[in-house]
Amino acid sequence: NLFLKRLQFLKFKLGHERKIKSYQIEQNWYQRHLNLPVNKSFRIPRCYLNISLKEEQIILLEDLDNAGFPSRKTNISIDEINLVLKFLAKFHANYLNEKTNGLWEIGTYWHLDTRQEEWVAMEDSPLKKRAAEIDKILNQSQFKTLVHGDAKLANFCFSKDADKVAAVDFQYVGGGCGMKDVAYFLGSCLNAN
């Protein structure tokens, strides 16, 4: 089995430029990995086909369910959290000081430049007052790498016995501090309790 991602640009309304660009970024990411052997230190789907046509793009990927990663989690154990953190550490180490060519300059879906409406809506607080400073520190990190950019729990696929993990959804991959992925992942594992 294979997994087909097909995006038809005509279906997007005006004002969705960032969303369209995110799919182009993902296509660029998979172009870097087209027909490469499977990376054993961190698992992503193999890309078999990556084409752009006039009004659509098509990416043909390995089906991770058939590759031994059929499980998706909504609740996660400490061991599974550690497994994902090890994945992210290997991912970030592999791409340390990598150029962002064709990817987001500032990776991640959530960064201050893209979340101004949410920032304005926040109640006055120390976090709101220091948001620009925190964002600047993260963006000027000495140890830049490529970040997954949307490292939430839903974007990780687990083996049946939960001793291996793979990542999907690379629409917001780009440059940054690896802690952005770590913080977003850990936050996605929390619930109201």
Show the residue positions of the predicted features.
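Short hydrophobic-acidic sequence motifs that mark active-site Asp/Glu residues
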Residues: 3, 60, 146, 167, ...
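Conserved protein kinase catalytic core
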Residues: 11, 68-69, 156, 175-177
